[in-house]
């Protein structure tokens, strides 16, 4: 059921996003406690603000009311993917070159299963991350197939 709702929502929201020069980042349909949440994450090259989220929410809500694809009651949330957004697609990694990332691996590289540093390169096959170890820097090349998950990392 959840997969179908996600697909239908993605189809409904894409034309709305195109009109506003925004793009779909992700859609989730999850039950938390007793409540269902339909979460639509939007993005653009220049970022997303509250006004963008409001416009998309209002227009998508109208489309969902018209088509009524969801049987149960739910809460609709439209937001940006956030500062520590997951990097799920190759496009997300390419856009994140030069930024700090946190990468979790399926198997350790140099004894580490998680690495954090600046993503300096991504070619579709490998990621290159520059990590800091005390006062020196080390470059680590990671096969993309070994990446379990990746996200942006906020540095303080």
Swiss-Prot record:
Similarity section: Belongs to the RimP family.
Upper taxonomic lineage: Bacteria, Bacillati, Bacillota, Bacilli, Bacillales
An example Gene Ontology biological process: translation
Protein name (database record): Ribosome maturation factor RimP
Native species: Halalkalibacterium halodurans (strain ATCC BAA-125 / DSM 18197 / FERM 7344 / JCM 9153 / C-125)
GO cellular component: cytosol
Functional summary from the UniProt entry: Required for maturation of 30S ribosomal subunits.
NCBIfam families in alphabetical order: PRK00092.1-2 (NF000928)
SUPFAM superfamilies named in the record: YhbC-like, C-terminal domain, YhbC-like, N-terminal domain
Superkingdom of source: Bacteria
Alphabetical keyword list: Cytoplasm, Ribosome biogenesis
């Amino acid at each position: 059921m959840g997969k179908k709702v996600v697909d239908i929502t993605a189809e409904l929201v894409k034309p709305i996003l195109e009109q506003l020069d925004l793009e779909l980042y992700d859609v989730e349909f999850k039950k938390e406690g007793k409540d269902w949440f339909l979460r639509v994450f939007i993005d653009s090259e220049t970022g997303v603000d509250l006004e963008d989220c409001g416009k998309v929410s209002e227009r998508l809500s109208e489309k969902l009311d018209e088509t009524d694809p969801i049987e149960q009651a739910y809460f609709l949330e439209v937001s940006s993917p956030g500062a520590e957004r997951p990097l799920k697609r190759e496009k997300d990694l390419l856009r994140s070159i030069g930024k700090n990332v946190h990468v979790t691996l399926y198997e350790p590289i140099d004894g580490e299963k998680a690495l954090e540093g600046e993503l300096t390169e991504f070619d579709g096959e490998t990621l290159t991350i520059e990590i800091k170890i005390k006062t020196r820097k080390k470059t680590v090349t990671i096969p993309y197939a070994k990446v379990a998950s990746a996200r942006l990392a906020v540095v303080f």
